[in-house]
Amino acid sequence: MKAFTTLQGLVCPLDRANVDTDAIIPKQFLKSIKRSGFGPNLFDEWRYLDHGEPGMDNAKRPLNPDFVLNQPRYQGAQVLLARENFGCGSSREHAPWALDDQGFRVVIAPSFADIFFNNCYKNGLLPIVLAADIVDQLFQECEAAPGYSLKVDLAAQTVFTPSGQAFLFDITEHRKHCLLGGLDEIGLTLQHADEIKAFEARRRVEQPWLFA
């Protein structure tokens, strides 16, 4: 998993509330269990003018010119700005996979669905909850200023605007530790590799019948 420390990232404003996981990555693309390759189908039903299916050449599909991801000023965005209850609906880890594959490292919203929120942390994506009035302000600033970017400092748990405003956000120490170190659940386990090996060696001596 990629470590997250600080990010200065272009912001893409998705001005929709209650964006569910089927909108983030439609169900027909869930057959793959690889974590890569989902970016071109992120927000597929809004992004393209036709119906997407696995195996289609996305480069040849007609784009929806009104959708934010297709607008030149938001190309290369790493921060997604969203409205309340982002990531609601069915549980699918493919949703943060698709956001990550598109290049997003941070999602900022007033609230998130619980399962999506937890899945983000497991996949190196930082979901940040800010008050609705602050999110409103960020939308206004982003839409008014092409090239609008935010600095996110995870160690300081702070979002900085171009004007220098600072907004604190909450995160548990455990999740912060994992993101700063780029540690998923396997990585956390491997931090205790020596203790695990010592336990297994001790068990072979104390309970040899288990290994006969």
From Swiss-Prot:
A single GO cellular-component term from the record reads: 3-isopropylmalate dehydratase complex
Catalytic activity entry: (2R,3S)-3-isopropylmalate = (2S)-2-isopropylmalate
Biological or metabolic pathway of the protein: Amino-acid biosynthesis; L-leucine biosynthesis; L-leucine from 3-methyl-2-oxobutanoate: step 2/4
Name any Gene Ontology BP term: L-leucine biosynthetic process
EC number, UniProt record: 4.2.1.33
EC category name: lyase
| Alphabetic keyword roster | Amino-acid biosynthesis, Branched-chain amino acid biosynthesis, Leucine biosynthesis, Lyase
GO MF entry, a single one: 3-isopropylmalate dehydratase activity
Q: Summarize the subunit comment.
A: Heterodimer of LeuC and LeuD.
Which family, according to the similarity comment? Belongs to the LeuD family. LeuD type 1 subfamily.
Briefly state the protein's biological role. Answer: Catalyzes the isomerization between 2-isopropylmalate and 3-isopropylmalate, via the formation of 2-isopropylmaleate.
UniProt protein name = 3-isopropylmalate dehydratase small subunit 2
